[in-house]
Structures are given as C-alpha cells and as structure tokens.
C-alpha cells in the first residue's frame, strides 16, 4: 500500500441552486518521502485536494488514506488532532506572528506537538542561523517564507503541504525555497506536496499529478528529478 492514497474522492459545493463539483473522482497514490507537485490552472481543484489531505476540509465520498488510515472517516475532533500532529502547512503568504522573533515563531511548534524539532537547529537548516532574533518585519520575503517552512517542519509532520509556496517570491529567492523543500524530501525523508500552476516546476518532482477541470488528467513519475540549481522557470 502506498503512503498516501486518494480513491474515488469527490467534493461538491452547493451555491444557491447550483452544485459545483470541486473534485470529481480523484485517484492517485504517493510514496513516503516523495516530493510531489500537483499541477493545474486556477479552479482545477488542486487546492481542494490539498485541503482534504491536510484535514482542513472533508470530502463527500471516497477514501483518503494516510499511512494506512482513512482520514475521510474522521470526525471534527479527530481531524483537529491529525492537523496538529501530522501535517505541516506552507502557504503563499507567510502567516508569521509579527511580535515574535523568527525563533519564537518556530518554537510555536513545540506548543502543539510533544516531539518538536529544536527551533534553533531547524532555522539553521533553512539558512537562518544568523536571523534567530529578528522579527518578521526585519526579514525579507524569502526569509519569512523560510521561517514559515521551519515552523512547519519543526512539528516533524508526516506531510508537508505547500500551496503556491513561491508565488510571492522573486526568481532567485523562489529557487532557494524550492531547494529547501527538495532537501526536506531527499535528506530528511519528508513527504512534500506542492500545489502550483507553474508547469516549469514539474521536473524537480518525483511525481507530478496533473489536474484539469476538477479531476486528475494524468500522472507522471520522474525517475531522475532535476536539481533545483539547474532549474529555469
């Protein structure tokens, strides 16, 4: 059994008299430690998939298996525990607490889980060893995003879920952030899932899940993912 599996997953929304199908019979599998890109245009349903995998939303039908457990059967309390213990989130905007230092922002993880990584070492791992005591306003956009990644991985999550993580960053800074995410997968064993509309990022992934019109249109496996250093986008 794969580490993550979505099987015949559907998500529907009701808007007035209109039913919107956000996910239509979604099927895919992801292995532990892979860097996966979910690729598609706006409205393709990829963020809905990410929200369901992260326990921030629930599907209406089908299975969502994480490490052998079907989280689609979880109640609200079980989903909260799952989000707290097993999932790290990185978004396009950094969501840092402005009156806490970089180190204090990452230390928030230790208030959520019992086996959190050391905040200082985690920030060193993302290249911010000299910025531990800086506040978010004193950091560049790329540095703030690295703090948000450090905060997410400090929880030791089963899944690191990233929604357009470089969407607000310049080219060079975006590559630095992608390098960190690729290293988390390759060297730390993290299972990293990135949602993006940017098809140029596909070569860095172990697996690319293409979405179109609320469904998975194709899946490709890269036997030799491209190193970030050589990526042009």
Short names for language-model regions:
Residues 207, 215-233:
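Conserved beta-strand-loop-alpha-helix hinge in the C-terminal portion
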Residues 2-211:
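ABC family nucleotide-binding domain
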